[in-house]
Amino acid sequence: MLGYRPYLIVRCSPLALLIIHLLLRIVHSQPTAIIDLLLFNSVALTAALSAYFSPLLKERFARISIALAIVFWALGSTFSTWDAFFSDYFPSALSDIAYTAFYPLLLFGLFRTLTLHPMKRNEIKGEIIDTLIIGFGVSGLCAGLALKSAMTNFEGSALSVFLSIVFPVGDVILVAVTISLLALQRGNLRNFLFLLGITIFTATDIYFLWQSSISTYAFAAITDDGWLIGLIVISES
């Protein structure tokens, strides 16, 4: 683990970079590679480092899983943002895979952060696993049923439309599981922070999807920083 001063630098870096990004975005309204590719994704990557070295996360696999989840999201963002600025395109499947990997990794990390007594953890482990299975099953079924009708309202291939449904469904699952853990752990403060981060991230996702559906989304909008704020709060939990 890092010493106190190095960790303090790592921990403060995401927020400092976010503030710089917001200020530059206000000054420069037009998208630029430095602000929206390099700086934007640097916030997410430093948030991943902060989560990995966090002394609050005593469970090693929880740190690794949460950090990897944020790294994969940052990779997905980097791939898609790169394509917006340069002619050398990354295959869209790369960003889709990276974004999709965010959800199971974050769910696994959330489960591993349980701070309950080991005996109590064993008692509720089966309940959480059942909840995850049911949640993913119902979500997958709903996404499949919605796919046909969504094709008439969203542009793009069947895969892109399906992913546009799966991503917010994944957000909802994360919120639901976090709320369940809050109830099981009687309002653990870390889970409140996790819920806040997931809620901010989810709200940004839904807002992005809504704007995209009515063709009003503007690339590199200041509202995109909601994703970064959510990830920073998650890394602090």
Model-found features: residue ranges?
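Polytopic alpha-helical membrane-helix bundles and their juxtamembrane interface segments
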Residues: 1-237
